From Swiss-Prot:
Alphabetical list of CDD domains matching this protein: DeoC
Source species of the chain: Escherichia coli (strain SMS-3-5 / SECEC)
Molecular-function GO term, any one: deoxyribose-phosphate aldolase activity
Keywords: Cytoplasm, Lyase, Schiff base
Pathway(s) per entry: Carbohydrate degradation; 2-deoxy-D-ribose 1-phosphate degradation; D-glyceraldehyde 3-phosphate and acetaldehyde from 2-deoxy-alpha-D-ribose 1-phosphate: step 2/2
Example of a GO biological process term: 2-deoxyribose 1-phosphate catabolic process
Record localization: Cytoplasm
Primary role: Catalyzes a reversible aldol reaction between acetaldehyde and D-glyceraldehyde 3-phosphate to generate 2-deoxy-D-ribose 5-phosphate.
CC per GO annotation: cytoplasm
UniProt catalytic activity: 2-deoxy-D-ribose 5-phosphate = D-glyceraldehyde 3-phosphate + acetaldehyde
Protein name: Deoxyribose-phosphate aldolase
Keyword Lyase set for record: yes
Length: 259
């Protein structure tokens, strides 16, 4: 197996196969569930809006893949600093049956100098998730923070407040995941000594098998080749799947989605 094939198989099994579009429908989510079951293995999860969780759960069970996890998003994509709303949305997502919640950090508040509200928001959402055995991923929106010091600070605050994963981006802004921001965030995980309990998720803009290989190589460099498993590493993507399958000898590499 070539290096690209090997990394593509790894990446496929680490994907949070995503649809977060305004025109999502039950039919599109059902199709996403079908795509998550591939000839070479399943994606780790799907990521959808909360209202589609029940139909996704039913579809995954019916197709014989109940182990594919269901992730959803809250405080999304705006990252406002209203803790009560973020918490209410997170509780609602849990009630819908989410296995994982990706909450947007109040990044604009941090840019304006307020570190406390981010900590408090993540902590509140973490307490709700922990009580239900739900994983919490925190989206810090690196492409808007831009500054390395702010990316580090948002990562540190999220981890201290209980994040199970730190995630680069919503996929809804001009600049999403980049290898540079990925390295900064994973270095924070390393420097804080939390690599056993905290994972990393690049999202938005990871579109090709070569992109995925590049991101995995950073993780391997920092933590060794065994770290990037489904508990410690995810790719938030949709169009990536077709490219990975093509690299693995399945399909033509074309995708209908741009995430």
């Amino acid at each position: 197996m070539t290096d690209l094939k090997a990394s593509s198989l790894r990446a496929l099994k680490l994907m949070d196969l995503t649809t977060l579009n305004d025109d999502d429908t039950d039919e599109k989510v059902i199709a996403l569930c079908h795509q998550a079951k591939t000839p070479v293995g399943n994606t780790a999860a799907i990521c959808i809006y909360p209202r589609f969780i029940p139909i996704a759960r039913k579809t995954l069970k019916e197709q014989g893949t109940p182990e594919i996890r269901i992730a959803t998003v809250t405080n999304f994509p705006h990252g406002n600093d209203d803790i009560e709303i973020a918490l209410a949305e997170t509780r609602a997502a849990i009630a819908y049956g989410a296995d994982e919640v990706d909450v947007v950090f109040p990044y604009r508040a941090l840019m304006a100098g307020n570190e406390q509200v981010g900590f408090d928001l993540v902590k509140a959402c973490k307490e709700a998730c922990a009580a239900a055995n739900v994983l919490l991923k925190v989206i810090i929106e690196t492409g808007e923070l831009k500054d390395e010091a702010l990316i580090r600070k948002a990562s540190e605050i999220s981890i201290k407040a209980g994040a199970d994963f730190i995630k680069t981006s919503t996929g809804k802004v001009a600049v999403n995941a980049t290898p540079e921001s990925a390295r900064i965030m994973m270095e924070v995980i390393r420097d804080m000594g939390v690599e056993k309990t905290v994972g990393f998720k690049p999202a938005g803009g990871v579109r090709t098998a070569e992109d995925a290989q590049k991101y995995l190589s950073i993780a391997d460099e920092l933590f060794g080749a065994d770290w990037a498993d489904a508990r410690h590493y995810r790719f938030g993507a949709s169009s990536l799947l077709a490219s990975l399958l093509k690299a693995l000898g399945h399909g033509d590499g074309k995708s209908a989605s741009s995430y």
